[in-house]
Amino acid sequence: MNSYQEMVEPKETIESETNFHNLSDKWTLWAHLPHDTDWSINSYKNIYTFNHVENAIALCETIPEIMIKNCMLFLMKGSIKPTWEDPQNKSGGSFSFKILNKNVFEIWKQLFYSLVGNTITNDKEYLKYINGITISPKKNFCIIKIWMSNCKHQNPDKINIDIIKGLGIQGCLFRKHLS
């Protein structure tokens, strides 16, 4: 495969999006190679932008498990870039969860769907401050993060752990993006 896009773009083209179901936000999937030491925005690859339920499902179901376990992926809301320096991220932080490799694929998919479907939390005020999710591979586990636009909302109890099986708040850490 020559590009990230070839790995994840839905295989079938749907003729018309007129009957599609709108999401409340537009989302972009970004990728970054874990061993790339360039952290400028140029090193991130914009994979796919979508704002319909059907496109979200097609994308999520197309991403190979090996890519989820071995590539840094960023699912970001609207025009938010996957960097701490983005104006909508710089005053924020993220919740970090350590996930064993055997659980990563399923947890990523559950988080993906709960994020774009606005069910990641029941608190609508809290939901407004969630900018995206990321995954970073390590040797035997991955770190999954939920990015927040500010540091006022540091309570992981607000995240719907019940619908994301395997994601626990025990051991969850919140870290500011920039000091």
Where are these regions (language model features)?
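Short aromatic-glycine-(Arg/Gly/Cys) micro-motifs in beta-strand/loop hairpins
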Residues: 20-42
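Conserved NAD+-utilizing ADP-ribose enzyme module
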Residues: 1-16, 24-26, 42, 63-179
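A generic structural signal for alpha-helix starts
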Residues: 51-54, 103
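A short, exposed loop/beta-hairpin motif centered on an aromatic-Gly-Thr core
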Residues: 44-49
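Short active-site loop/helix that positions an aromatic residue
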Residues: 54-65
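Non-heme Fe(II)/2-oxoglutarate
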Residues: 40, 53-56, 87
